[in-house]
A protein has these predicted regions:
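Flexible "arm" and connector segments at domain edges
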Residues: 1-54, 58-84
């Protein structure tokens, strides 16, 4: 599946659950939780759990971006422009 299609599906999923109208602090805490899970999976060298945690972290980050009015594409582009 193409990234843009995934983004649209994630956006719809969040909307269907009302997450797109949630308090951004809640989604920020979700990102922290997922980062903790990723850290644990990495430390245990558990690849499948790392894949799951990375995916969950990306979903949470995309939703957080929407909640705080940051275009995720613009953000990654700006980051790339700083490192290139």
């Amino acid at each position: 599946m193409e990234y843009e299609d995934l983004f649209k599906k994630i956006t719809a999923w969040a909307h269907d659950r009302g997450i797109d109208q949630a308090d951004p602090r809640v989604e920020f805490m979700k990102m922290a939780e997922e980062l903790g899970e990723l850290s644990a999976a990495y430390n245990k060298e558990h690849h499948a759990k790392m894949v799951d945690s990375i995916g969950d972290l990306q979903v949470a980050l995309l939703i957080f971006c929407q909640l705080v009015g940051v275009d995720h594409k613009e953000a990654i582009e700006a980051a790339y422009n700083q490192i290139k």
